[in-house]
């Protein structure tokens, strides 16, 4: 059997084979490569070899692909219900490459400790039903707004690269307690994140952490020393906007991790919303501008 590699983006041989044949294990692949049951361009290959469009993978006809059936996945009623909402109620935009949803606050993007329901777990149900959705970025559980989901592997690679190359511009709205000294400005810091610890600001000249850059603009003065601020992150560090708001002296309303509970008004919700995303035409051939409506509690606070 001959497989013509059709992806324009290089991929490790073992990962490429696993996408085609999910039942193939790493051990089986490496053994087949050692025995030349699987070759690339008629040459012996390593599992780490990167294959790309134009390459040919040869699989010996006598090589037995695994025939056992995968275990039946079990999904909860909540995951099935959420999967339906992702493709209906939460859906903002869809094309051949991606979908964009308006994630509500309180819903996790990915699973974790004490998290039983997430966007990712619902996508697994949709993929079980024949889709090929892949997360390409995340929002904090308490953050609402625009979340992009790739429709296939190639689109996910393009979007991952686009985020790295700064071809995706995201804009957030936040209600903060207090305001920066300047109404328009830029925040630069290092953000350090150790495994199992909460992200923290470190000195810009420190060797610890990674550089984080955020632009901001004060849009409106509200009551009770609250302000509406627009944040545009240049980098994408964990909790970046929440930490930078705190660094500016104006923590986000409802942020119980980085805010000052003793002086800030109590809020059930955290007022941080991913409002706009602009995708450069360099990603999929045309520029796309997407917007997610503010949640009801956010709109009510602004009036």
From Swiss-Prot:
The active site is at 140. CDD domains: PseudoU_synth_RluA_like, S4. Residues 11-70 form the S4 RNA-binding domain. Keywords: Isomerase, RNA-binding, rRNA processing. InterPro entries: PsdUridine_synth_cat_dom_sf, PsdUridine_synth_RluA-like_CS, PsdUridine_synth_RsuA/RluA, RluA_PseudoU_synthase, S4_RNA-bd, S4_RNA-bd_sf. One of its GO terms (biological process) is enzyme-directed rRNA pseudouridine synthesis. The keyword Nuclease does not apply. One of its GO terms (molecular function) is RNA binding. Responsible for synthesis of pseudouridine from uracil at positions 955, 2504 and 2580 in 23S ribosomal RNA. This is Ribosomal large subunit pseudouridine synthase C. It comes from Rickettsia conorii (strain ATCC VR-613 / Malish 7). The gene is rluC.
């Amino acid at each position: 059997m001959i497989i013509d590699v059709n992806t324009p983006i290089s991929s490790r041989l073992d990962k490429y084979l696993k996408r085609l044949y999910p039942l193939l294990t790493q051990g089986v692949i490496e053994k087949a490569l050692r025995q030349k049951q699987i070759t690339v361009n008629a040459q012996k290959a390593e599992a780490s070899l990167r294959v790309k469009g134009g390459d040919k993978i040869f699989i010996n006809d006598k090589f037995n692909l695994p025939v056992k059936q995968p275990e039946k996945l079990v999904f909860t009623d909540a995951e099935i219900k959420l999967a339906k909402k992702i493709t209906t109620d939460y859906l903002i935009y869809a094309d051949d490459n991606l979908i964009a949803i308006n994630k509500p606050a309180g819903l996790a993007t990915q699973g974790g400790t004490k998290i039983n329901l997430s966007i990712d777990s619902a996508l697994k149900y949709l993929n079980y039903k024949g889709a090929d959705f892949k997360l390409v970025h995340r929002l904090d559980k308490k953050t609402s707004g625009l979340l992009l989901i790739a429709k296939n592997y190639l689109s996910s690679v393009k979007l991952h690269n686009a985020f790295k190359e700064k071809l995706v511009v995201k804009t957030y709205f936040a209600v903060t307690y207090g305001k920066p000294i300047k109404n328009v400005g830029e925040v630069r810091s290092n953000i350090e994140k150790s495994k199992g610890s909460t992200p923290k600001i470190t000195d810009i000249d420190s060797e610890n952490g990674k550089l984080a850059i955020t632009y901001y603009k004060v849009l409106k003065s509200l009551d009770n020393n609250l302000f509406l601020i627009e944040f545009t992150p240049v980098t994408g560090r964990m909790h970046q906007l929440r930490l930078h708001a705190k660094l500016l002296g104006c923590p986000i309303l409802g942020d119980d991790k980085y805010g000052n509970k003793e002086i800030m008004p109590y809020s059930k919700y955290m007022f941080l919303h991913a409002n706009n995303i602009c995708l450069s035409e360099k990603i999929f051939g045309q520029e796309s501008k997407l917007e997610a409506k503010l949640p009801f509690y956010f709109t009510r606070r602004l009036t």
